[in-house]
Regions:
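Predominantly flavin-linked oxidoreductase catalytic cores and closely associated redox partners
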Residues: 1-124, 179, 183
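Flavin (FAD/FMN) cofactor-binding core of flavoprotein oxidoreductases
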Residues: 65, 121-142
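C-terminal catalytic lobe of FAD-dependent flavoproteins
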Residues: 92, 97-126, 142-175, 181-187, ...
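FAD-binding beta-loop-beta segment adjacent to the flavin cofactor pocket
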Residues: 133-164, 287-300, 310-327, 334
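Active-site-proximal substrate-binding core of FAD-dependent oxidoreductases
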Residues: 160-166, 178-230, 340-347, 370, ...
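C-terminal auxiliary extensions adjacent to catalytic cores
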Residues: 224-279
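Short Cys/His-rich Zn2+-coordinating modules
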Residues: 302-313, 337-343
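Iron-sulfur cluster-binding cysteine motifs and their immediate structural context
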Residues: 318-349, 355-381, 386
Length: 389
């Protein structure tokens, strides 16, 4: 563009990366310096959330968490309903991204969840006024990368500090930020920001409640790989006794769990189409509108498909569908055209910056190099406008 100005270069002796789950720069750092070597790959979940305004009085302080419905027994996740101030409710659905169904759609599952009589008693007759989506790091203790390297530290969700069974992580982000600040201060006083000096950050984390808490529940999420009932039994046993594996292993990248449509075990409850209305049950594009997301159409797309041909020859041919058109909670990806002219159309302006696509994309373009066929980079400008989320 004629008025284009390159971004400002900012130099620092130490940079603290706190970009949230699957941060663009944080993941580059992790892969470039092999910070996850000898540890499990990170496991993620996708959460979608709506704020609903009702006509009757609300239930401030209400907090409901559910497990399962409308998910199959092979999918880890559930819903929630929070009563906010006045006549507002926050309703959402969270699903582990290690599902095997190529047609699974979490936004659609949220609509089905809202149809349940238990949820309807709170939101019936209401209207959606806000929407958002985000991934969560669920891998736990064994998936935490080495959190330091020359001139850099990782904090919060970028490092994977989330306690899955307790649904807590904000206090870990705050504590890791405090410990990172202490480490940076010491490094600046010494005039040495090398990995040798910054390694004290990992020691501080190990002696804090952050890693102690995560170690206690280190095997909880992995137990649900076997299904909901075995997961509850094994996960609960390991969490309350502290027993179970003490070393990393047995965990695969989320995208490797996808299976052909006719082989997926989690399809039994994910085939029924959702029903929509003009208020509380909305389709995906309507939710995108309520997210407030905006991107200038004349900027370079921040989402690219590196090898579009492989979408047809590898992805659709193997899975019987285009998984990205389902797992994206913002309808960024559309399968258009017929026959040999079919292609994936990228509507980058819809993006709500959840990062699901780069985690769940089943095509690894260079075979296990952690470079997926979908490339997501921070846009020049724009994004969702979270309101009350």
């Amino acid at each position: 563009k004629p008025n284009y100005e390159p971004g400002t270069r900012i130099y620092a002796k130490v940079t603290v990366f706190g970009e949230g789950p699957y941060g663009t720069l944080a993941e580059d750092l992790i892969h470039r310096f092999r910070l996850r070597e000898g540890r499990n790959p990170q496991s993620y979940a996708l959460g979608v959330k709506e704020v609903i305004r009702v006509k009757h009085g609300g239930s401030p302080g209400l907090a409901v968490h559910t497990l399962g419905y409308p998910l199959s027994a092979r999918v880890f996740g559930g819903g929630f309903c929070y009563g906010l101030a006045e006549n507002l409710y926050a309703v959402g659905m969270v699903c582990g991204l290690d599902w095997d169904d190529p047609q699974m759609d979490v936004q659609e599952l949220l609509q089905r969840f809202k149809k349940h009589p238990f949820v309807q008693q709170f939101i019936k007759g209401g209207e959606v006024i806000a929407y958002g989506a985000k991934t969560l790091p669920e891998g736990g203790y064994f998936s935490v990368p080495r959190p330091y390297v020359d001139g850099a530290l990782l904090v919060g969700d970028s490092a994977g500090f989330l306690n899955v069974p307790y649904l807590k992580g904000i206090h870990y982000a705050m504590k890791s930020g405090m410990l990172a600040a202490e480490t940076v201060f010491d490094a600046l006083v010494q005039g040495d920001a090398s990995a040798t000096v910054l390694s004290s950050y990992e020691d501080k984390l190990a002696s804090s409640y952050v890693m102690r808490d995560l170690y206690r529940v280190r095997n909880f999420r992995q137990a649900f790989t076997y299904g909901r009932l075995p997961g509850l039994l094994l996960g609960g046993f390991t969490m309350w006794t502290g027993l179970g594996p003490t070393k990393p292993g047995g965990v695969r990248e989320d995208y490797t769990h996808l299976r052909p449509l006719n082989e997926a075990a989690s399809t039994r409850r994910t085939r029924e189409p959702a029903q929509y209305d003009a208020g509380v049950l909305v389709d995906k594009l309507t939710d995108v509108f309520y997210s407030g997301t905006q991107h200038r159409e004349d900027q370079p797309p921040h989402i690219r498909i590196l090898n579009p041909a492989r979408c047809l020859t590898d992805c659709i041919a193997r899975y019987g569908d285009a998984p990205c058109t389902h797992f994206c909670p913002a309808k960024v990806y559309d399968l258009v055209g017929e026959g040999e002219h079919r292609r994936i159309q990228v509507n980058f302006a819809n993006c709500v910056h959840c990062k699901t696509c780069v985690i769940k994309d089943p095509i690894d373009v260079l075979d296990a190099d952690h470079v997926q066929n979908i490339d997501w980079r921070a846009p020049a400008e724009g994004g969702p406008r979270y309101q009350g989320l």
